[in-house]
Amino acid sequence: IAGMWSEEAAADLRSRVADLPVKVVTGMDGLLEIAVMPEAQVLVTAVVGMIGIRPTIAAIEAGKDIALANKETLVTAGHIIMPLAAKMGVKILPVDSEHSAIFQSLNGEPKGRIEKILLTASGGPFRGKTREQLQNIQVEDALKHPNWSMGRKITIDSSTLVNKGLEVMEAKWLFGVDLDQIQVIVHPQSIIHSAVQYVDGAVIAQLGTPDMKLPIQYALFYPDRRLMPGKRLDFYELAQVTFEKPDMETFYGLKLAYDAQRIGGSMPTVYNAANEKAVGLFLDRKIAYLQIPELIQEAMEQHKVIENPNVEEILETEASVYSYIDGKGF
């Protein structure tokens, strides 16, 4: 079975695989059909955006473990997803490098033993720059990440630290901790993928080369660890491992994430949707780089919060934010 979002793309695929025993499905109905396939025990959620919410809920209700590579699902609907997963007895296994590192560092320890989650960030390509130096940043500059090779949107998000803001929100739901227990640490070498500090002062971290194959494989085969060829971390080659505080004044997209999560309700959805729209406009060269956090802040300031939004209200909030930014006429 294969799913394509548009009917046109599905028709094209059907013609290409006509001589194969492959069923081609389309749209949200297609995603939902794939999500609950009885043959599968684990659903890898790797779609981009809030389109992942409904299939993830359907898979959980069908008793499937979730390998989660879609931040938006927990950012916007964590209050729905995590209680449902607990009720159904299914595991939410993080695929994100940082959240996988935290998951591995926790190793089943009770929540009460966690003092702090240390969420690492590379700092992106503009680490150390002032807001004045960021005024004339072009799309090409922002698409050069120092350590990771990723898609266009997430690379821009990493440069603004909004990606780290989304990861803070995701960590709050995944690990059931208070927002103030999540500390972002800039670690330019991306060797320590994240860590957990316990109530006795011990810090347990997961280290490795910057390679997404490890967290992906770990989520797919959990609780097993399997042989994986590839470059190993050589401590003798590590010239230095450094840490800094994030600059939340220059890169205030990260601060806005903490603000949105503290407010709660539908505000994290506003943060996420406004960023998606703003990044799209920047990639289309319709707004300046520094307008990305400005648009997020403006969208948050004009929003009337809905407490405990259901899925329909989450999607309506997303649409209203898109409409608000469209109305600015960029």
Regions flagged by a language model, labelled:
Residues 1-330:
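Catalytic, metal-anchored helix/loop core of enzyme active sites in primary metabolism
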